[in-house]
Amino acid sequence: MKQNKKNLPIILASSSPARIELLNRIKIIPSQIIPADIDETPNLRELPAPLAIRLAYEKAIKVASQIEESAIIIAADTVAAVGRRILPKATTYEEVKNCIKMVSGRRHRVYTGLCIIKKENDQLTVRQKIVQTIVKFKKLSDEEINFYCSLDEGIDKAGGCKISGYAEAFISFISGSYSNVMGLPLFETVNALTSLGFKVYNR
């Protein structure tokens, strides 16, 4: 009788609480969390989507080079943009405020680059995907902007916004994956894992 091959362990190349939570939603608990410390500075004239997929790949490949065991490495990078202008991962109150002002009353796009690498017997199999979600904020008053900034929710978030927090009350329209805006598109993640032989539903 043929025995089912056991799944390889999952390594998440990120310490993002949102990405950990999203994996938990699909009943995947990473065996290790190894944040990849890379330079996330955009290249000259680099566009948002290519930036997101490049950074995701660099994170995944760095972790793959650090481990000796066979595993599946999940890496992602989320970039928010207004047109071709990349919004920063806000680190200060002022950066959050500037980002929120830019998206107030208009549509912006959130891109997540997803890179999943299967490392087995020193062989690497790579799956990559770029996922885009369109988000529109209502026109915000100064009072609303100042209140949101005072919450510190947007610190360290792409575009200065945490979609699963208070900012959700500002969204008038969203087209595409909600989990993508949170930092990990689950539909694409499951598809990529399945294509690599990981049993998502029968474990």
Swiss-Prot record:
Keywords: Cytoplasm, Hydrolase, Nucleotide metabolism. Its EC number is 3.6.1.9. Its main location: cytoplasm. It is found in: Cytoplasm. GO terms for biological process: nucleotide metabolic process. Nucleoside triphosphate pyrophosphatase. May have a dual role in cell division arrest and in preventing the incorporation of modified nucleotides into cellular nucleic acids. This is Nucleoside triphosphate pyrophosphatase. It comes from Rickettsia felis (strain ATCC VR-1525 / URRWXCal2) (Rickettsia azadi).
